[in-house]
C-alpha cells in the first residue's frame, strides 16, 4: 500500500488477511493527504481469483467508456492535452492531465458524465490477496492475460481455521488432522505458473531479503499482464516465537526450503533467460532449522526415525528443486570437460 495505495484495488480472500484487513472498527488501510487510499473488498474463500478478475475487467471497461466519451469532446480540448491523454503516462502525470481536462471542460454542455468519471483515466493497480489454502488452485485466472497482481501469503497451511494441511504444506510437517506428518512434497506453485510463459512469477521472503521483496513487487505491478508473488508468511501454527521470524526466514532460505527468484517474461525479449535466481544454493543444515518449529519437532518427538527419514527426503527434494531452478536461470554447474 505504501507503493500503490492511492490507486489500489484489493480483492481479499477470506482468511487471516481478511480478518486483520477488514475487522472493523480498526483497519490497517488509510488515505493520503489527498484522501486517496486502497479500495478493499472481501470475497468468499473459494472465488477470490474470479472476484479480483472482475475488478480488472470492470476497470478496463470503465476506462474504455471514458475514452469513448473523451473522443466526443476532442475538439473542445487543447490538442496537446488530447494527445497526452491518449499516450502512456505515470499516475502522477495522468492525474495532472485529468485536472487540466476538468478545467477545460467545466461548463461545456454534455460533458458532465466525462467530468464525473475522468479519474478512470488513471491506471488502477489491482491486487488479489489471500493465503495458500485459497491460492494454490488459481491457475484458471493466470491462464488468461489480464493485468492482475496476485499476492499469496503462504503459511503452508489453512491458518485461519486452525492449521490444517493444504497443498502448500511441506514434507514432514505436523498439522491439525495430520499428526503423522505430511508424507509428500508441497506443490510448487511458482514453477507450475512459470510454464505458462506469460505470467510474472516471484517467490519472496521479507525477512530473508528485503531488497528482493521490494524489487519483485515493483516488477510485478509494472508487468502488463498477470503476476504472481508467493510470499513466505510466518504463522503461529508453525510453533515458534514469531519475534524471531526474520531469523527463521533467513535460515529457511539458506537451507533451500524457501528459494528466492523472479521470473519475468520480458527478459526473454532482451535475449536473457526469464528466470533470475536470487538466493544461493542450499548450505545450512535443514533439520536444525526445522527443529526451531513445533510443527516439525512434534513428529521428531513421537516418531524420531520417521522424522529423520522425512527430513532426509525433504533435503533431497529441496536440492533437486533448487537445481531445477538453477538450470532455468542458467546457473547450473557445467560438467567437467574431458
Where are these predicted regions, by residue range?
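Glycine-rich ThDP/TPP pyrophosphate-binding loop and its adjacent helix/strand module
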Residues: 107-109, 113-114, 120-149, 153-280
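P-loop NTPase catalytic cores that bind/hydrolyze ATP
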Residues: 10, 14, 227, 305
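Residue-identity detector for glutamine
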Residues: 2, 61-64, 96-97, 103, ...
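Flexible, low-complexity linker and terminal segments
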Residues: 33-87, 231-338
Amino acid at each position: 500500500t505504501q507503493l500503490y495505495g492511492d490507486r489500489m484495488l484489493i480483492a481479499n480472500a477470506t482468511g487471516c488477511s481478511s480478518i486483520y484487513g477488514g475487522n472493523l472498527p480498526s483497519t490497517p488501510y488509510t488515505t493520503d493527504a489527498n484522501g486517496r487510499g486502497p479500495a478493499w473488498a472481501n470475497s468468499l474463500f473459494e472465488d477470490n481469483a474470479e472476484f479480483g478478475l472482475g475488478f480488472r475487467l470492470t476497470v478496463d471497461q470503465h476506462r474504455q467508456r471514458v475514452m469513448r466519451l473523451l473522443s466526443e469532446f476532442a475538439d473542445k480540448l487543447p490538442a496537446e492535452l488530447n494527445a497526452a491523454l491518449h499516450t502512456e503516462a505515470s499516475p502522477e502525470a495522468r492525474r495532472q492531465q485529468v485536472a487540466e481536462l476538468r478545467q477545460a471542460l467545466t461548463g461545456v454542455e454534455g460533458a458532465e458524465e466525462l467530468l464525473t468519471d475522468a479519474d478512470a483515466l488513471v491506471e488502477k493497480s489491482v491486487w488479489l490477496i489471500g493465503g495458500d489454502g485459497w491460492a494454490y488452485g488459481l491457475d484458471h485466472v493466470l491462464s488468461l492475460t489480464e493485468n492482475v497482481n496476485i499476492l499469496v501469503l503462504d503459511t503452508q497451511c489453512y491458518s485461519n481455521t486452525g492449521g490444517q494441511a493444504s497443498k502448500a504444506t511441506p514434507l514432514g510437517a505436523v498439522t491439525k488432522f495430520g499428526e503423522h506428518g505430511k508424507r509428500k512434497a508441497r506443490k510448487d506453485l511458482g514453477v507450475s505458473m512459470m510454464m505458462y510463459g506469460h505470467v510474472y512469477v516471484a517467490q519472496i521472503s521479507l525477512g530473508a531479503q528485503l531488497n528482493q521483496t521490494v524489487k519483485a513487487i515493483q516488477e510485478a505491478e509494472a508487468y502488463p499482464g498477470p503476476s504472481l508473488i508467493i510470499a513466505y508468511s510466518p504463522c503461529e501454527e508453525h510453533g515458534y516465537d514469531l519475534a524471531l521470524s526474520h531469523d527463521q526466514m533467513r535460515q529457511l532460505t539458506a537451507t533451500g526450503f524457501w528459494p528466492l527468484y523472479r521470473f519475468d517474461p520480458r527478459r526473454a525479449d532482451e535475449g536473457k533467460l526469464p528466470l533470475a535466481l536470487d538466493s544461493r544454493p542450499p548450505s545450512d543444515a535443514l533439520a536444525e532449522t526445522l527443529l526451531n518449529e513445533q510443527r516439525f519437532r512434534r513428529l521428531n518427538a513421537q516418531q524420531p526415525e520417521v522424522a529423520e527419514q522425512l527430513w532426509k527426503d525433504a533435503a533431497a527434494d529441496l536440492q533437486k528443486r533448487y537445481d531445477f531452478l538453477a538450470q532455468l536461470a542458467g546457473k547450473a554447474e557445467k560438467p567437467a570437460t574431458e
